[in-house]
């Protein structure tokens, strides 16, 4: 029977069918608390465990100031993102690059946002591969007493990746809600273990709070790298519009209400995780703290094993949160631009290849601390600290020297400093660590 639909209607129906298949737009029935634990899972992760180490590189005064300032600035820029999601009546900017295209034009917006967002999301997935593998390795070390065969870190990263070869086939954000909730609970749990176990261990006899580096250059470079560690700890902006896209919206009840409620709850949890871990961890261990606080804690063994296991569960959820927008980008390109059919086979191939790629890079370059500093400044600073402000200024055009104009420009200047300085320190740290590194060890 011939179709009675006009070509335009047929095209529209085809477009809707594709949107219903793509991960970001396929399900819009999320509750406000979904946004809370998705944001906690996206934000609290490997970054919190490096904060005492960052404090050791920054020192008490600058460290506390930067932690608080970052919390305030990123909450403000996250509010901007939530507000701009439905700034055009009848339209939703479901993806970060769609907002960028509205602000800067179709092509320029794509070129500005997509490379940065991909660097962030792929970078996070790689770092979390390393984090998951290292935490599993630590569990093995603590539980397996002599005589015990040494197992390479590479194999633990592979074990961690094997979970994602399964979970990555969940179709959308709402489908991974259970994984994300478990991850959010784990983040609060291992953060509590990290600071409470530090308190139990007490202030170390030889504790020192001065800068660890022997040279002025070393101190400066470590300071720069620590800025990236802090930036890495506030990374949720890269997926916030994609998370908000899952919440239902009507003109009477726009999605920004429940989304903002979830963000506020998430930021309270972030504060409860970050500040105690950063301050107590540094207070107890001083400048000898490891780049992952759990590595500084050896006893009680059962508690540290539990904390590392919680980290594994959490970064499983975090990996999925950051991988979902990447899956969406790749699948959109293949289906809309290259005219592939939206099938399960396509999804199976794309997602398995992505997991395999991040696993391979993680195995090859497992420099945890340096990776945080490098990715933190190079990619997170733009998308988290100042790109939302630039988009806000481009669209709303607040009056020059007004409060909104001044706040946004302050955020832009601070974000630019972070973007320029942090990768320098992070790259130096990677180079120093790589001197003693054997590939696939």
Task: Provide a role label for each language-model segment.
Residues 169-175, 181:
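Intramembrane alpha-helical segments
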Residues 54-90:
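Extracellular loop-to-transmembrane helix junctions
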Residues 1-50, 74-79, 93:
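Membrane-interface "cap" regions at the ends of multi-pass membrane proteins
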Residues 54, 166-169, 361-366:
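Hydrophobic alpha-helical transmembrane segments
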Residues 46, 71-80, 160-169, 388:
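Central hydrophobic cores of alpha-helical transmembrane segments in multi-pass inner-membrane proteins
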Residues 51-59, 173-174, 370:
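Short, hydrophobic transmembrane alpha-helix segments
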Residues 62-63, 175, 258-261:
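Residue-level recognition of membrane-helix boundary sites in multi-pass small-molecule transporters
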Residues 6, 27-29, 33, 79, ...:
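Membrane-interfacial loop- and helix-cap regions that link adjacent transmembrane helices
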């Amino acid at each position: 029977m011939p179709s009675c639909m006009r070509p335009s209607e047929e095209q529209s129906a085809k477009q809707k069918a594709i949107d219903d298949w793509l991960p970001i737009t396929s399900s819009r029935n999320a509750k406000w608390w979904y946004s809370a634990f998705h944001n906690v899972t996206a934000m609290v992760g490997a970054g919190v465990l490096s904060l005492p180490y960052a404090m050791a590189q920054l020192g008490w005064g600058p460290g506390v100031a930067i932690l608080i300032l970052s919390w305030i600035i990123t909450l403000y820029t996250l509010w901007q993102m939530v507000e701009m999601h439905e700034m055009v009546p009848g339209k939703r900017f479901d993806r970060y690059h769609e907002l960028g295209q509205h602000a800067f034009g179709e092509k320029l917006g794509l070129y500005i946002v997509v490379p940065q967002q991909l660097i962030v999301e792929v970078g996070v997935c790689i770092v979390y591969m390393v984090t998951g593998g290292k935490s599993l390795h630590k569990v093995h070390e603590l539980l397996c007493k002599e005589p015990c065969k040494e197992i390479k870190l590479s194999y633990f990263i592979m074990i961690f990746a094997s979970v994602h070869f399964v979970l990555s086939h969940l179709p959308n954000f709402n489908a991974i809600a259970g994984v994300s909730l478990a991850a959010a609970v784990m983040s609060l749990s291992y953060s509590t273990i990290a600071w409470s176990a530090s308190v139990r261990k007490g202030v170390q006899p030889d504790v020192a709070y001065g800068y660890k580096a022997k040279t002025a250059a070393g101190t400066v470079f470590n300071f720069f790298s620590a800025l990236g560690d802090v930036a890495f700890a506030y990374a949720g902006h890269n997926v916030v519009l994609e998370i908000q896209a899952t919440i239902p919206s009507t003109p009477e009840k726009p999605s920004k209400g429940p989304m903002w409620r979830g963000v506020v709850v998430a930021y309270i949890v972030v504060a409860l995780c970050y500040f105690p871990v950063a301050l107590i961890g540094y207070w107890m261990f001083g400048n000898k703290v490891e780049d992952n606080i759990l590595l500084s804690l050896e006893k009680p063994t059962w508690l540290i094993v539990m904390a590392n296991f919680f980290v594994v569960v959490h970064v499983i959820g975090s990996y999925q949160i950051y991988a979902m927008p990447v899956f969406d980008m790749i699948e959109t390109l293949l289906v809309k631009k290259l005219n592939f059919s939206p099938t399960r086979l396509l999804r199976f191939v794309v997602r398995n290849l992505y997991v395999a790629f991040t696993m391979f890079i993680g195995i090859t370059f497992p420099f945890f601390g340096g990776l945080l500093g490098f990715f933190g400044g190079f990619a997170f600073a733009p998308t988290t600290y100042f790109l939302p402000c630039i988009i806000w200024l481009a669209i709303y055009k607040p009056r020059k020297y007004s409060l909104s104009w001044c706040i946004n420009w302050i955020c832009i200047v601070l974000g630019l400093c972070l973007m320029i300085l942090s990768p320098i320190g992070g790259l130096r740290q990677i180079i120093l660590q790589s001197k003693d590194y054997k590939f696939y060890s």
